[in-house]
Structures are given as C-alpha cells and as structure tokens.
Amino acid sequence: MFRRRPPLPPFPPGAALVGGAVRDWLRGVRSADYDWAHPDPAAGARALAALVGGAAFPLDEERGYWRVTAGEVQHDFVPLPPNLEDDLRRRDFTVNAIALREGRRLVDPLGGQQDLKRRVLRMVSEDNLRADPLRAWRAARFVTTLSFTLEPQTEQAVRQVAADLKAGRLPFPAWERVRDELHALLRSPDAARGILTLEALGLLDLTLPELREGQGLTQGGFHHLDVFEHGVEALHQLLTRRPDADLLLRWATLLHDVGKPRTFARDPDTGRRSFHGHDRVGAELTTQILTRLKLPGADVKRAAALVKAHMVQLPADDAQARRFVHRRRELLPDLLSLMLADREAARGPSSSELGRFAYMLAMERVLAALEEQPAAPPPLLSGKEVMALLGLTPGPRVGEVLRALAEARALGEVGTPQEARAFVQRWAEETPGS
C-alpha cells in the first residue's frame, strides 16, 4: 500500500524516534523533521550531530530540549520518559502514537500501524483530544494531507470539541497555533477538500466565519455555485493549474469573493443580483481575517491587494497590456492566476467556451507584455530634474509627473532623457495641477 521505506538517520544509543517521523517512515515518506526521546538529550544530540555532520545546540537546557540541524533536516531531542508506552498513550492519534527503537523495533501500544494500513485517523482517546482542542484542527489537517478517513467516533468527538469551543466550554487555542494548522492544510494539493472538511467538522465557523457567510448565497449569471462553494472551487482550480502557488495566493483565491455577502443587493424590478464594491470590502475582510490569524503585515497587505484587484478589466490590445503590467507589476503573475481560477470556477448560464477563450487571449497579452518587460525600467529623470524643468517645489505634483513619465516609458512612448523632458513639459501643460 505504501512506498518502500526510506533510510533512517543513525540512532544515537538509547534513543527512541517518536511522532510524525515514524508515521511517515512507515508510509514510505522521507521526513525533514525528526523527534527523538533520549535518556540524555544533550549527549544524544551531540552524538547524532557528529554522525550526520550537523550542529547541536540547546533549545531549553533546563528542560533538556536540544536540536540538531543538518542541511534541510532538523532533529529535536527531549528527555526519554520513564514509561515510553504511557507517553505514547497521551498523544493525539494512534498513527502518531508509535515509537521506533534501535534495530527498527516498533513500540505500538494502540494499533497505529493497523490504522495506517487502513488509512484511518483514530483518536487515542476523547480526553486526549479535549486536553488540547487544537487537535481538532489537526484532525482536519491529517485527513487532508494524508488522504485518510476519520474514524466515526473520532469524528463525533471532533464535532463535540468544536461545539464546546463555540459555547465557551473549552479554551480556544492561540491563533498562531490555529494558523499553523491551517497553513499545513492549505499547503496540501487537496486544500479545497480540506476547507470542506473544516466545514463538515464545525471548525470553519470558528476559524473563518466570514467565508461561511457565502453559503446559500446564489449568484446567477456566470456562476453555477453559491459564493462559498465558488471560493472553494476557485482554490481547487488554482491548485490544478499552479500546484506551486504560495500560501498568500492560496489565501487570496479562497477569500477573493468574501466581500460578496456584505455587498449583496437585488434590483426590485428585475430581480438581478449585484455585489458592487465586493472587491474593496473583500480586501478589508481579508485584512481582518489574516491579521486575526497573526500573519505578518506585509503578507496581509499583499493578499488583500490581490483580492482588491481581482475584478480589474483585462486589456483589449497590446498597449493596454503594457499599461496593465506597469500598474500592477508587483502583483503579477499571481493576480492572473487568481483571475483565471475565478473564471474557471464559474460555469453558469452566462459562461461560454468563447468567453473563456477570449479571456485567455487577454491573459496571454499580459503575459507577453510581462515577458517583454519583466522589471520596471530605470527612471529617465529624477525628481530634482522634474522640479527644475517645471519650476516646482517638493510636493504631490512632482510624484504625479514622475508616475506619468514612468507609465509613458513602460508603454514605449519615451525612451531617452530628451524625450522624457519633452513629455514632462507637454504633460504638465495638458494636465493642470490640483
């Protein structure tokens, strides 16, 4: 069922390999993170570092936590518990409650190997699940990333954890921890299925309630799905075409229409639905969501910018394509990937093969313009030169002139300092200052 088992790192004497690395090894997957339990973590870490040519250093000397780094591989050491089997019984799921001793001797008190073979995710106990409610999100993540089935009693227990979290009967995990589980899920090729799993388990309402607002909100026209389903399908379409898409693009694609429920209106005469300004409101909501999840400010800003720009009109000719690239260069090519995923996730009555073909042609114009000029050309005139030429003092007008000149250069309308000076003088005459 699984691939051939990869080679293991050398075992420091007395160590036990525990956790996900054992699970992955049994599945035939090479791990980049190894968790070790050792009677003397410092000695074990130093011994392994010498064997693999890595560096050993303490993470928390008082508690006996050590780490070894060797290239892209990381090894963490903790003290070996007095009773290894008892320690395994305190873990989250049976497939993670397996240890490996020297000589490839497995310690599996809960039948984790059998669950691995059956591709079933089973909790060790409901008490363990409730002891750390984050394990509910871990269940959704493992079901998604391992393509496992959630055992029925475990599914029921996860649903109960979600209900108790919502009712305040259990403490909510730190948002940073929730974010890390979401990111592990979103990195999966099956991320769209993972979002649906979160919804089925009652966890999406706790995590992304704004996204759920689109459930049942039909759109008509180009769309065959409701707003929520369309966002999930757009994520699926993105990963079909760009399996290497980074997390920010995945977030932006999932959330690109999150503003629609709050901008929904219906014409009383025609019954036609509209969502005017949903791109702007969606960008604001994206900022709120990703800030809540503690993403870095620069990442939040970029994801929100992608959401805000996803409705921009594609160019009708080559000149417009060059202008498109100049004005949105920092978002490319990700913006095009988002827009294409959006279009491919819409197969309503107004959608047609001819329309999709025309859309692709417009995208190809933009890609050609981006390939022709992958980076913005250096400025032909400085701000000081513009001020001297037009008799200006420092202020917004100088920025307006420089932006107009930069666009003219990107469009190929000017190419030399002499042409730039003539353009600036002409532009200033034709464009009165505010």
Curated annotation (Swiss-Prot):
Q: Which cofactor does it need?
A: Mg(2+)
Task: List the InterPro entries.
Answer: HD/PDEase_dom, HD_domain, HDIG_dom, NT_sf, PolA_pol_head_dom, PolyA_RNA-bd, tRNA_CCA-adding_enzyme
The UniProt entry, under SUPFAM superfamilies, shows: Nucleotidyltransferase, Poly A polymerase C-terminal region-like
Q: Which residues form the HD domain?
A: 227-339
| Top-level enzyme category | transferase
Lineage of the organism: Bacteria, Thermotogati, Deinococcota, Deinococci, Deinococcales
Checking Pfam families in the record gives: HD, PolyA_pol, PolyA_pol_RNAbd
- Record-annotated residues binding ATP? 20-23, 91-92, 96, 132-141, 177
Q: Which residues form a coiled coil?
A: none
The family line of this record is: Belongs to the tRNA nucleotidyltransferase/poly(A) polymerase family.
* Source superkingdom: Bacteria
The protein's name is A-adding tRNA nucleotidyltransferase
In its UniProt record, which GO terms are filed under biological process? Answer: tRNA 3'-terminal CCA addition; tRNA surveillance
